[in-house]
């Protein structure tokens, strides 16, 4: 899987890109919110950003969204939804999603 991930000069620049629809920025903003990096930890808001990026086929966001459904972070725990998002990501070659999908079976 090619590493063509973007980087931003500041958190504010990343947030602006996310708000403008950049899927990678949305994914990273979700990670920041999930982990409380640079912002207050907020699982529900993290899920919102993961979903925006996942709906644009971002495999990292799809994997994180699957993890949220697996663990019940920010959403009700739903193994079927976890599998759905891990599968979407795994089909794009994400190794973490492939591992997590395998663990569900």
Model-derived features: positions:
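Hydrophobic face of amphipathic alpha-helices that form TPR/SEL1-like repeat modules
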Residues: 28-35, 64-71, 100-105
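Short helix-capping/linker turns of helical repeat alpha-solenoids
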Residues: 19-22, 35-37, 42, 55-59, ...
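N-terminal leader/linker segments that initiate helical-solenoid repeat arrays
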Residues: 1-9
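Low-complexity/repetitive intrinsically disordered segments
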Residues: 88, 95, 102-105
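Leucine-rich, hydrophobic repeat-scaffold detector
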Residues: 10-24, 31
């Amino acid at each position: 899987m090619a590493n063509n991930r973007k980087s931003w000069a500041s958190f504010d620049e990343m947030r602006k890109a996310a708000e403008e629809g950049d899927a990678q920025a949305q994914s990273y903003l979700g990670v920041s919110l999930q982990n409380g990096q640079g912002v207050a930890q907020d699982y529900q808001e993290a899920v919102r950003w993961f979903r925006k990026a996942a709906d644009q086929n971002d495999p990292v966001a799809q994997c994180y969204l699957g993890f949220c459904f697996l663990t019940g972070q920010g959403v009700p725990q739903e193994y079927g939804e976890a599998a759905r998002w891990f599968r979407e990501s795994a089909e794009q070659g994400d190794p973490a999603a492939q591992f997590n999908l395998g663990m569900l079976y």
